[in-house]
Amino acid sequence: YNPSIKPVPIEQQSKWHYFADHEVVFWRSDCNDNATAFSFKAGPPEGHGATAKVKAFPDWRLSSGHAHPDAGGFIIWANGKYLTGDSGYAGVPMTEHHNTLVFDGLGQADEGKGHDAFAGVSYDRLNKIKLQNVKMSETGVSLVADLTSAYEAKVGVDKFTRRFAFTAPGNFEIEDTVKLKREQTITSFLH
């Protein structure tokens, strides 16, 4: 908490923001009930800043139990309702609960074994999950997410990028480029 920061009414705040540490983009058309708003996430579970902290404090242990394996996920709200969203939390965080991809049924990190899908996963590798070419304006957003490192090597993802674009008033485009090390079934979730 920083008491020197003065409150600003939401109507006077920026309608979009790129949270670079966590690689999250948020955009809204306005503050009305029928506004269009969305978020897109593609970063390491504790943010990029955690990489240096893990190295600086060797006795510190990450616990990402509240983070989800949702790199590349997005939520869209328009005209007073969700157009897309996550399916909800079912006790064990799973990639399939989010708007992203699984490969032969395998999702991101080391999901499915408990509450912390990132336990034992190399944070240096997770730190490579990132947004690129983020462009935001009053009329839209375009970005590319490199999601390759969200998946363990055993999953067989050689490269996975997702292009996400929005052009006001309501055109969304999502384009995935995937290169696999072996033939497998790709499942795309849209909730």
Predicted regions and their residues:
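Extended polysaccharide-engagement surfaces of secreted carbohydrate-active enzymes
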Residues: Y1-H191
